[in-house]
Amino acid sequence: MTIKQLHESDRPREKMIRLGARCLTDAELLAILIGSGNDRQTAIQLAQEILAKMDNSLPRLAKCDIQELTGSFRGMGPAKAVTVMAAMELSRRIPSQEMPRRESITDSRMAYRTISPFLTDLPQEEMWVLLLNQSGKIISMENLSRGGVSETSADVRLIMHKAVSHLASAIILAHNHPSGTVRPSEQDIQLTQRVQKAATLLGFRLNDHLIIGDDGAYFSFADEGLL
């Protein structure tokens, strides 16, 4: 059975137009993104299979990459996978835009709220820097690297260059641990110390270094008295 063979009231697109997005199940919303199923399943059935394999967890789905989706599910080609990943990325960015960019970052919680949408539910490790003016307001947020702190730790000069080129008075580092744990590694500690030393020499501050984990957990070097 195809979606077109379903009663109109049960078709996800028509149901969304009639009742609104909130009345649809996760599988129905995902089916709209997928668009079509395969020779054995409707789009809804394919969406249900995908969610079941993800333990019905949208954060788990958000951690997938295109290769995982296309390689694990019949009928999921690159175009469908890209559409799903694009929707996941848009939802990830919403919280960061709800906080005014000109609001001063005064504590670790505000810094976390600003940067976490870019570092949550990622399959790989990434390092970002928040560049702040004298009032603690964001000048820019920059992605420094993807792949791990071991690679990033060699890029202290890049961090300093970005701070100087943006005339920043302070910076906040942030990276994620895909494992979900927020305990700093020895590499994390060494990188923080190197950046703090370099920042002091150049006349600006390292206000914090955040490690982003799962379920809203984070570690703040500033809160723990490590700066």
Curated annotation (Swiss-Prot):
GO aspect biological process, one term: proteolysis
Molecular function, one GO term: metallopeptidase activity
Residues that bind Zn(2+): 175, 177, 188
InterPro entries per record: MPN, RadC_JAB, UPF0758, UPF0758_CS, UPF0758_N
Domain MPN: 104-227
Top-level lineage group: Bacteria
Keywords in alphabetical order: Hydrolase, Metal-binding, Metalloprotease, Protease, Zinc
Record's keyword annotation contains Cell membrane: no
Keyword rRNA-binding applies: no
Residue ranges annotated as motif JAMM motif: 175-188
NCBIfam families membership: PRK00024.1 (NF000642), radc (TIGR00608)
Family membership: Belongs to the UPF0758 family.
Protein name as annotated: UPF0758 protein PG_0894
Organism encoding this protein: Porphyromonas gingivalis (strain ATCC BAA-308 / W83)
